[in-house]
Amino acid sequence: RTQNQLNQRSDQVMTLQAGLAQWTADLDALVQPPHTQALDWDGRALRIVRRSTTASGDGLLVVAWTRRNVGGKGQWLRWQSPPLTTRGDLQVAWATAAQWAQNPGDAEKRLEVAVAALDEWKVFYFRTGAWTNPLSSDGAAPPPPLPGAADAANKPAGPDLVLPDGVRLVLTLPADGAISGTLTRDWVRLSLAGGNS
C-alpha cells in the first residue's frame, strides 16, 4: 500500500513536470503570422499559435490550456490542433480552441490531454516593466508607429496583436496532491532573454 502511494505521488510529480515543460515549449515555439493574433488569455484559456512539433515545413499548431472540472475535480488540460497550413485553417483552429475551453464537444475532447489536478490558475503578462492582468488595458499599449510608413501602414497593431515580454503562470495545486499550494512559473520571450527562457 505504501509503495503504491509513493508510486502515485511520483507519477503526479513527473506528470506536472512534463506539463510545465510542455507549457514552456509551447511558449518558446510561439510564432506570430502577419496580422494574426498569436497569444490570447480570455480568463478561461490561454491560446497560442506555435511552430509544429515536427519539421518546420509542417505548418503551425494552435494549442490551448485551460482548467475544467472533470469527474468533480479541477483538472489542468491542454488541447492541440492538427498541423495547419492555411490562414483559414488557422482561424478555424483558433476558434475551435476557444470553443474547447468553454464547452467542448466529443471531437474537441479527443484532442485534449489531462495534465494535472488543479484548483485554480491565473495568467499575467509582463508589459512595460510590470506584470499585468492580460484582460486589463493597463500596459497593453500598442507599439509606437514606424517612422516613414504610409498612414494606413502606420496604424499600430491593436493590443491583441502585441506580444507581451513575458507570461506568468500561477497554479494553485490541490492540498491532497504530491505537490500542493501555489506554484509560479515565469516565461520570458526568447528574443528578450538572449535565447534562454
Predicted regions and their residues:
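Aliphatic-rich helix starts adjacent to a transmembrane/signal segment
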Residues: 1-24, 28
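Short, glycine/small-hydrophobic-rich surface segments
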Residues: 27-50
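Residues embedded in well-ordered secondary-structure elements
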Residues: 37, 54, 107, 158-160
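Solvent-exposed loop and beta-edge segments used for protein-protein assembly and interaction
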Residues: 40-42, 57, 161-165
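Type IV pilin-like appendage domain
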Residues: 43, 49-136
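Short linear sequence signals and composition-biased patches located at protein termini or domain-edge surfaces
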Residues: 116-197
